[in-house]
Design a protein with these regions (language model features):
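An N-terminal structural lobe/cap that precedes and organizes the functional/catalytic core
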Residues: 1-28
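C-terminal, well-folded lobe of enzymatic/effector domains
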Residues: 22-174
Length: 174
């Protein structure tokens, strides 16, 4: 959840007290965020600029995350799949009738068959989907003609352990 301007975003805002994320809040977010470090980082860098306290910031993050239905192709794939960035947007629009393509930004690595890194959904302050700003321009975030969506689970049975699935890239409101 990143507060932002039309061009750019505020970050690491000064607060009366040093930003602290309680263990209970961190633990409560690990089902949708892949690590403790990321939970802490997101609040310190972006949450401090949101005007919300730590509980309010993560409550809103969860509310917006759960408001988005992740299309089946992006939930726990067991093999690498390839999509054009516009098809990623189409899938999210089809799964979420209130979304339009301009509300979604696809981010990927470099190269023609780059790996999907994030799917960003842009929201207004009141939680309504809005067109993403210039800092979410696709030519900056993902210029690949095709992107790879890798598997999120270990498929090697000989290990005897199945990896805990990571959530699909957080369609973090931006």
């Amino acid at each position: 959840l990143w507060p932002q301007y039309t061009k750019g975003w505020p970050q690491d805002c000064r607060t009366p007290r040093r930003p602290f994320v309680p263990d209970a809040v961190i633990s409560g977010m690990l089902d949708i965020m892949p690590s403790r470090g990321l939970v802490i980082h997101e609040y310190r860098k972006h949450g401090t600029c949101s005007g919300l306290d730590v509980q309010g910031y993560f409550q809103l993050s969860r509310q917006l995350f759960t408001s988005i239905r992740i299309p089946a192709d992006f939930v726990n794939p067991f093999e690498t799949q390839y999509f054009e960035p516009r098809d990623v947007k189409r899938a999210f629009v089809a799964a979420n009738p209130g979304l339009r393509p301009e509300h979604i930004a696809v981010a990927c690595g470099r190269g023609n068959r780059a790996r999907l890194s994030e799917i960003r959904i842009c929201f207004s302050k009141d939680g309504k989907p809005i067109a993403c700003g210039q800092n979410e321009a696709e030519r900056k975030l993902c210029s690949a003609s095709e992107i790879a969506v890798p598997p999120v689970r270990s498929t090697r049975r000989e290990e005897g352990v199945q990896a805990t699935p990571r959530p699909s890239p957080l369609p973090g409101p931006r």
